[in-house]
């Protein structure tokens, strides 16, 4: 505890640097990837066919998910995966994940496979739920 109190300035710099790096890394993709809130996601889904890819762990996915979403692992993103191969390159894709850092690598992998119309649900499934939007679970 003494180390922390003696180096609080160092810890603040570390935290601020991490936040800036996170913002630059994820925010830097904003010209290519649209970050949308829950209502924007509803508009996206209702306006044209949208593939919803959920990269949370299976137990979280089983508890609450958006209807018709597909649960994948980051490792599933490759040109041989049937779930990925079925997605046409011009389809809109809505991504859901728990981590911005995980999303960064997922987006890069999808872009490497020539998917361009990528959207991210800001706040993940929690923002969807807090907007009182419907979810499915294994008991429904």
Segments and roles (model prediction):
Residues 41:
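Basic phosphate/pyrophosphate-binding loop/patch that engages nucleotide-derived ligands
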Residues 1-38, 47-50, 58-92, 98-140:
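Rhodanese-like catalytic fold shared by cysteine-dependent sulfurtransferases
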Residues 53:
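Active-site flanking residues adjacent to catalytic metal/cofactor-binding acidic residues
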């Amino acid at each position: 505890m003494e180390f922390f109190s003696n180096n609080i300035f160092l810890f603040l710099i570390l935290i601020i640097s991490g936040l800036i790096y996170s913002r630059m890394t994820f925010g830097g993709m904003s010209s290519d990837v649209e970050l949308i809130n829950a209502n924007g996601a509803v508009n996206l889904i209702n306006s044209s066919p949208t593939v919803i890819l959920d990269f949370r762990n299976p137990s979280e996915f089983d508890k609450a998910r958006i209807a018709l979403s597909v649960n994948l692992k980051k490792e599933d993103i490759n040109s041989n995966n049937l779930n990925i191969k079925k997605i046409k390159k011009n389809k809109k894709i809505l991504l859901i994940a728990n981590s911005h850092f995980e999303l960064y690598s997922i987006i890069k992998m999808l872009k490497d496979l020539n998917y361009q119309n990528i959207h991210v649900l800001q706040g993940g499934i929690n923002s969807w739920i807090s907007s009182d939007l419907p979810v499915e679970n294994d008991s429904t």
